[in-house]
Amino acid sequence: MVKILKTGLWLRLFAAMGLIGGLSNIATAEDWAEDQWGTLSGRELDIAAGLELTWGIKIMSFGALLMILTQLTRASTRARIGASLIVIFVVSEGVTVSTLSGRGYGEDASLPVAPLLIAGLLALLALASCIVHWNDPTDA
């Protein structure tokens, strides 16, 4: 089991997903805004698209940070930083969605099931690999 839970691999995959997902969100911010907020026009659409653009930048920034820290760290340090960043990211995304949902975000929208399942699975595998390697001896 430990052989498939290689911390570096799963953290890099999760970071790459963040980079690609964030870039996708940035590129299609206006489409996301229309899908999640319903019929908007003019300034409302600009504000909603700006929110989606900012969200994409946040996701991309997380992916870049995780990728860089994965490259710069080893052993238990990598596992501990990786686990911390995954938990922080998942909690912040949950808080963001729940806060916006109370304001009408996503009420009539289609839920992107496949990307959410893939992201959830990658997050779980990356977190599990970090937990398994939490106390690995440091490299000399």
Q: What kind of region is each of these model predictions?
A:
Residues 50-59, 112-122:
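Alpha-helical transmembrane segments of polytopic membrane proteins
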Residues 69-87:
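Loop-to-transmembrane helix junctions at the membrane interface
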Residues 94-114, 133-134:
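Membrane-helix boundary connector in multi-pass membrane proteins
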Residues 1-21, 134-136:
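Cytosolic juxtamembrane helix and N-cap/initiation of the first transmembrane helix
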Residues 81-98, 118-125:
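Hydrophobic alpha-helical membrane segments
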Residues 121-140:
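Membrane-water interface at the C-terminal end of transmembrane alpha helices
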Residues 20, 46-71, 88-91:
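Core segments of alpha-helical transmembrane spans in multipass integral membrane proteins
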Residues 16-56:
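Hydrophobic transmembrane helix segments
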